[in-house]
């Protein structure tokens, strides 16, 4: 199959004739940025994919254990790991020195579930080593 490089309205990879589009994220932190600070832009991308009849798969390069929502709820931002001032979601009144609190795993799970329900977006976590293989599997291309 020939490789064609072109701008896509949503996602990073598509196969002609398929209704699946794959958007890759190089870490959970990038995913958090997209569904947090850049939420409006990310939702527009999801809406464009749904309107065009595509199923969007967001493939996050991270530990595969995070495919389990219970494990993802325990995820802690690297920012929180370095900052003693960050509070857990249940505590109140304490803020990170930057004035805003980084996203926690519980919040991330809720946002991803909402996006899956509203727009049919699927989120999958895979190791960096297996990412290319997974892209080929989903698109039906020999690896």
Predicted feature locations:
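Non-catalytic C-terminal interaction segments of nucleic acid-processing enzymes
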Residues: 1-17, 30-143
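Conserved catalytic cores of phosphodiester-cleaving nucleases, focusing on short active-site segments
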Residues: 20-26
């Amino acid at each position: 199959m020939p490789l064609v490089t072109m701008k896509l309205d949503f996602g990073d990879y598509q196969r002609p004739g398929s209704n699946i589009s794959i958007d890759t994220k190089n870490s959970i932190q990038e995913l958090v940025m997209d569904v947090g600070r850049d939420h409006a832009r990310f939702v527009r991308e999801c809406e464009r994919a749904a309107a065009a009849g595509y199923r969007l798969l967001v493939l996050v390069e991270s530990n595969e254990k995070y495919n389990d929502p219970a494990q993802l709820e325990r995820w802690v931002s690297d920012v929180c790991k370095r900052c003693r001032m960050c509070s857990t979601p249940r505590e109140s009144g304490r803020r990170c020195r930057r004035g805003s609190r980084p996203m926690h795993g519980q919040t991330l799970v809720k946002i991803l579930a909402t996006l899956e329900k509203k727009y049919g977006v699927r989120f999958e976590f895979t190791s960096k080593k297996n990412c290319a293989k997974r892209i080929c599997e989903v698109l039906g291309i020999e690896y």
